[in-house]
Amino acid sequence: MAGHSKWKTIKRAKAATDNKRGALFTRLIREITMAAKLGGGDAGGNPRLRTAIDNAKAVSMPKDNIDRAIKKGTGELEGVDYVEVLYEAYGPGGVAIMIAAVTDNPTRTVADVRHKLSRNHGNMGTINSVAFMFDRKGQMSVAAEGVAEEALMEAALEAGADDVVNDGESFVISTDPGALHATKEGLEGRKYKVENAELAWVPKNTVKVEGENATQLLKLLEALEELDDVQKVDANFEMDDDTMADA
């Protein structure tokens, strides 16, 4: 039975091999800019910025792009004034959805999100209508191939992780939000290749979806992620592997 973390892995693999690479760069640049705006441009003292830079480097973003994004965040270069917004929603099958965006126009963004929801069997929720179903966590992954689960789990816990879950293709490692970067560095110091370090809304419990609800849900999640302003979508579902693979 596959869950939302596996769906994210599938979407990342597709993004790396098709024309969505430009959209991925845009999201990473906005995250770097936002991190620098909120925590300053010194990556040494700004864990969120360090993580954003690492993620950008992992997909071969040019250094000039990274430097410009930082300077726009700190105000050294003129740029768009972004703000972070968070939306809560329901999808097919009663699935709870958290939608994080970075935007220069919240009015436009909320209208875009509402439109995608209404066109894909979803509904916008009110504040805290679904957020209480999630925990705010740091997450990262390590490819499962060639990795001993027990050794990784021991290394992850020593580095500050709360939990390690094997989703079949990778190990998903969870931490407290403030321990994300330290845990990542601890694992890298043990020669593990850590990918996709990020803050996420992790569901406390999951809802099983199947049949038409599953198909509609995957279509909705993809439609939301295609919005320019949307940075991340988290949801509390699980579904069978065959349906997930056809996503």
Swiss-Prot record:
InterPro entries: Integrase-like_N, TACO1_YebC-like_2nd/3rd_dom, TACO1_YebC_N, Transcrip_reg_TACO1-like, Transcrip_reg_TACO1-like_dom3, YebC-like
Assigned keywords, A-Z: Cytoplasm, DNA-binding, Transcription, Transcription regulation
Subcellular location: Cytoplasm
Molecular function terms from GO: DNA binding
Gene3D superfamilies: 1.10.10.200, 3.30.70.980
A Pfam family recorded for this sequence: TACO1_YebC_N
Gene Ontology process terms (BP): regulation of DNA-templated transcription
Entry's Gene Ontology cellular component terms: cytosol
Similarity remark: Belongs to the TACO1 family.
Protein name from the UniProt record: Probable transcriptional regulatory protein GAU_0635
Taxonomic source organism: Gemmatimonas aurantiaca (strain DSM 14586 / JCM 11422 / NBRC 100505 / T-27)
